[in-house]
């Protein structure tokens, strides 16, 4: 019961006072299944992109963190090809920093900040992390191309293309260029 009333309050607050560049809503009639959109921050390679996220609220929320993943493909050292996010507040202690006092709005704001300021020292995508650390211009260019391809709104009149770019189409692939990103470069998020 505490979970349901808290979720209702959080959704009302997110609806009434959303963080800048963040939208969150209930998917269908299931309160445990939320969707969110984060607008890429200005000055970042994700600028102007609309990134869709899936939020699954666990039965033990707020004592367990929500499960969040990107539905829109994104070129980022802390987000893998399945959309999983390496962020300490998405994990329970001792490996993570989730606390019941945190809420979905705080988590979405933290993800938005992670998009602007990647953490190359705790990557999910080692090759992208190396690129970010040692060749920032190439990283920026690649991330910008991914944003243009997958996250920018399509020109008016192209509904199918718009769905594909936003990641909302059921058939959209969340796989990266597998030839360029070798399987061995994908490793689990390092423990702090």
From Swiss-Prot:
PROSITE patterns per record: UBC_1 (PS00183), UBC_2 (PS50127)
Query: What is the catalytic activity of this protein?
Result: S-ubiquitinyl-[E1 ubiquitin-activating enzyme]-L-cysteine + [E2 ubiquitin-conjugating enzyme]-L-cysteine = [E1 ubiquitin-activating enzyme]-L-cysteine + S-ubiquitinyl-[E2 ubiquitin-conjugating enzyme]-L-cysteine
Segments of skewed composition (Basic and acidic residues): 178-192
**What are the entry keywords?**
ATP-binding, DNA damage, DNA repair, Nucleotide-binding, Nucleus, Transferase, Ubl conjugation pathway
What family does this belong to?
Belongs to the ubiquitin-conjugating enzyme family.
Q: Which SUPFAM superfamilies match?
A: UBC-like
Domain UBC core stretches = 2-152
Could you tell me what this protein is called?
A: Ubiquitin-conjugating enzyme E2 T
So which domain of life are we looking at? Eukaryota
Q: Which residues form the active site?
A: 86
Could you say which EC number(s) this protein's record lists? 2.3.2.23
What does this protein's UniProt record list under function? Accepts ubiquitin from the E1 complex and catalyzes its covalent attachment to other proteins. Catalyzes monoubiquitination. Involved in DNA repair.
Task: Kindly list the biological process annotations in GO that this record carries.
Answer: DNA damage response; DNA repair; protein autoubiquitination; protein monoubiquitination
Q: Name one GO molecular function term.
A: ubiquitin-protein transferase activity
The record lists the organism as Xenopus laevis
Q: What is its main location?
A: nucleus
Cellular localisation: Nucleus
Instruction: Please state the pathway this protein functions in, per its UniProt record.
Output: Protein modification; protein ubiquitination
Q: Which GO terms describe its cellular component?
A: nucleus
What InterPro entries does the annotation carry? Ub_conjugating_enzyme (IPR050113), UBQ-conjugat_E2_core (IPR000608), UBQ-conjugating_AS (IPR023313), UBQ-conjugating_enzyme/RWD (IPR016135)
| Region called Disordered, residue ranges | 150-192
